[in-house]
Amino acid sequence: MLTWLEQFLIRYPELALFLVIAAGYWIGSFKIGAFSLGPVTGALFAGLVVGDFAHVPVSSMTKSFLFLLFLFGVGYSVGPQFVQAMKRDGLKPVLLAVVVCLTGLAAAIAVGRILGLDPGFAAGLMSGSLSQSAAMGTATDAVNGLAVPEAQRALYISHIAVADAVCYIFGYAGVIMWCTVVAPALLKIDLRDEALKLERSLGMSRAKPGLASAWRKFELRAYRLDEHSPLIGSTVAAAEARPEHRLFIHRIRRGERVLQAEPGTILAPGDVITISAPRQIIVELIGSRAEEVEDRELLDIPLISADVFLINAKLAGMNLQEASQQDWTHGLYLRSLSRGGQELPIAPGVVLQRGDLLRIVGPEPVVENAAKNIGVIVAPSNSIDFVVLGLAIFFGGVVGVLVSFPVGSIKIALSTSVGTLLAGLLVGHLRTLDPRFGRIPDGAISLMTSLGLAAFVGLTGIHAGPIFLSALRDSGISLLLGGMVVTLLPQIVGFCFGHFVLRMNPILLLGGLTGA
């Protein structure tokens, strides 16, 4: 049975890859406390097992194809925020990332030389220790460019996967331990308390409803005002001027007439008003203190929901509190806000950026007018602009091959990997200028990034499987100890630089360390 399975996997390597992907995601789903390998590292270990069991042939073109899809997807997803983040946040996060990355690179080079590691082991040491499995792809590109015999290159590429597998577990767990236990102890802070402080600085509230809840699901109801109502004698604008809640008066029935609620209209006893607000706000502010009226004509206000792509440069840079004070937001509700496929919390201090996707709700004329002030309405679509996708990767790869810079006596090219990543950044950024350009749905981007990297790493594991155990016996302990140094040194240096030099907020500092 095992012999048949071995021959089957060798004969049908594409099926072996799908087996590795499935096993990788299954392995990555297991958790020990807060620790889990994740699907990418799970795919690496699954690939090593399958590769050790059966010498499955691996196509280098397939590996490159998958890795380039992953890189383009990453660039595309962060492109809309990349330039804006540079403008908004300044150099602090960038400088922190540069220091951490350069320290990690220098540590990997130094440890590699001290231990006498070959290029493959050294590259895997870096990718595993820094828990950056994507570096396996660029390292493979670099190894393929070495002027050594083909057999030697194949051995080096196998060593990348071996070293990554050995170093990854501490590379992942070590950063978690540093950022959740050691660093907070050194800073003498409680992570939860600091996170709550940061939330409050952004206007978020967990204890009571505020802007976050008032800009979500809402009701449209009609109420008759009696002579004891606190709203009697006040204008519509004054009744709506509640900074802690978002409430709007749309129409007023006065006798037989239906009036549009103008800001200067004074409310009188007997008026029936239509109010839109979140359900809990209506209950808290009005509740049983007013008579609810079922007035079909008054309540017949067409409401629509629209996804609007933010391209207005004047709006970008405002926080939600400032944006909500614009004249054209009257009667408008923000149901959700997403950036790069990730939904953001709705709070007064959250700053808008070009490329954000806002789902707004309100009366049809209000939504249409707001969309003009925000950007353009994006119609739901599952179509992919394959023309832009293919040409961007092609020309990005061409630029990566042709552009080089001197380092000492040699020239180093950007490589197809870096070129493709830059192409993704460019296309993603251009979409902030015209969202109709290069459209790729979030689901497709997620597939490119998650499946692309997991499949690439799985193939690398399959390739390294036949020599994994022997390489582990020869270099396992030295790789593990060296990996610990490469994991912790960048964290320590980055922590000191961010805290003492940049004086960053503790939560942002620790977040930057995990991201860098």
Swiss-Prot record:
Taxonomic superkingdom: Bacteria
Any one GO CC term of the record: plasma membrane
UniProt family annotation: Belongs to the AAE transporter (TC 2.A.81) family.
Lineage of the species this protein comes from: Bacteria, Pseudomonadati, Pseudomonadota, Alphaproteobacteria, Hyphomicrobiales
Pfam family, one: TrkA_C
Biological process according to GO: potassium ion transport
Protein name stated in the entry: Uncharacterized transporter bll3475
Stretches that traverse the bilayer: 10-27, 32-54, 64-83, 95-117, 165-187, 386-408, 412-430, 443-465, 480-502
Keyword hit for Transport: yes
Residue ranges of domain RCK C-terminal in the record: 208-291, 296-376
Membrane topology reported for the UniProt record: Multi-pass membrane protein
Keywords of this entry: Cell membrane, Membrane, Repeat, Transmembrane, Transmembrane helix, Transport
Molecular function GO terms recorded: monoatomic cation transmembrane transporter activity
Xref: SUPFAM superfamilies: TrkA C-terminal domain-like (SSF116726)
Protein location: Cell membrane
Organism per entry: Bradyrhizobium diazoefficiens (strain JCM 10833 / BCRC 13528 / IAM 13628 / NBRC 14792 / USDA 110)
